Each structure stands twice: as C-alpha cells, then as structure tokens.
C-alpha cells in the first residue's frame, strides 16, 4: 500500500511517500492548482494511495477538497492526536 504523509503549511506542502513501510520519495508542492495537479499525476501512478495529513484549519481545507473532488482516500488527523502519536513513536 502507498501512504503519503503531507505536512501542510500556508503556501506549500511537503509530501513523503512510503510504500509497504519503506520510504520512497519526498517532494514539495505549492498549495495551488499547479501543485495539486502535480500531486494528482503522481497519485495516478500508484495503486490505492492513502493520504494522511494533520488538520491545520484553513490550510488543510484545500487538501481535503482536493481529496474529495478526486476521490482520493485520506485521513485527516486531529493535531493533538498527531502530537501524541509522534511522541509515542519517539519514546
């Protein structure tokens, strides 16, 4: 399975791609039409991709809409939940 973790900020996002638990690639996209088109082309080459990103309020809404419009599976995590999961991994 292909999992893509997305760190969303105001103008851009960092995407980290893992396949079967192994790191594949990291890349940046702009949070605009061109960036989302690039991401869509990348995702179209994968089998059953799953996007995972933290709910960052207004910044994550664009990614959520992108996923819904393009019927891409995604998990939107609560920021507090993401922090606890990250802390648990580090200990």
What are these language model-derived features?
Residues 1-91:
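Phosphate- and other anionic-substrate recognition elements at nucleic-acid/protein interfaces
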């Amino acid at each position: 399975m292909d999992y893509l973790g997305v760190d969303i900020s105001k103008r851009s996002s960092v995407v980290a791609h893992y396949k079967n638990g192994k790191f594949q690639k990291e890349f940046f996209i702009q949070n605009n039409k061109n960036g989302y088109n690039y991401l869509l082309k990348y995702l179209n080459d994968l089998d059953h991709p799953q996007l995972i990103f933290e709910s960052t309020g207004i910044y994550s809404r664009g990614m959520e809409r992108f996923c819904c419009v393009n019927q891409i599976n995604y998990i939107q995590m609560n920021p507090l939940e993401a922090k606890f999961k990250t802390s648990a991994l580090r200990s």
